[in-house]
Amino acid sequence: MPFSASDRHDITHLWEKMAPNVEFLGEEAMERLFKSHPKTKTYFSHLNVEHGSAAVRAQGAKVLNAIGHASKNLDHLDEALSNLSDKHAHDLRVDPGNFHLLCHNILVVLAIHFPEDFTPRAHAAFDKFLAAVSETLYSKYR
């Protein structure tokens, strides 16, 4: 998926805002996912997914750090996310529809915490980026 110069700018800018707070923001995105879509908790049955748990905080940080890695590799998402794609498809067997649900919650968190930066243009760019990340992650399901 080609990203325009303005897409790249907005994706990079939002990631730079997020990067110092990946644990906090990731935890909030995961908690929102679990609250709004309780069935997604089944993939984390081995973890304490209660509000404020260290496990949710760590998982949220892991998710956002992977997104940060992807944001630095916009032209090579397949390569950058290959191992993660394999893991989700073959080991974890996550329902690919859940990627969209998590992406939505990440966008909600961005809108809440960075209202000045989360302009309509930035929203569209980051949504496009997360859709590309999701598509890359579920590409190995075929």
From Swiss-Prot:
InterPro entries: Globin (IPR000971), Globin-like_sf (IPR009050), Globin/Proto (IPR012292), Hemoglobin_a-typ (IPR002338), Hemoglobin_oxygen_transport (IPR050056). Keywords: Heme, Iron, Metal-binding, Oxygen transport, Transport. Heme b binds at residue 88. Red blood cells. One of its GO terms (biological process) is hydrogen peroxide catabolic process. Gene3D superfamilies: Globins. Residues 2-142 form the Globin domain. O2 binds at residue 59. The keyword Metal-binding applies. GO terms for cellular component: blood microparticle; haptoglobin-hemoglobin complex; hemoglobin complex. One of its GO terms (molecular function) is peroxidase activity. The alpha-B chain is a component of adult hemoglobin B. Heterotetramer of either two alpha-B chains or two alpha-C chains and two beta chains. The two major hemoglobins, B and C, associate upon deoxygenation to form a trimer of tetramers, BC2, that has a much lower affinity for oxygen than either component alone. Belongs to the globin family. This is Hemoglobin subunit alpha-B. The lineage of its organism: Eukaryota, Metazoa, Chordata, Craniata, Vertebrata.
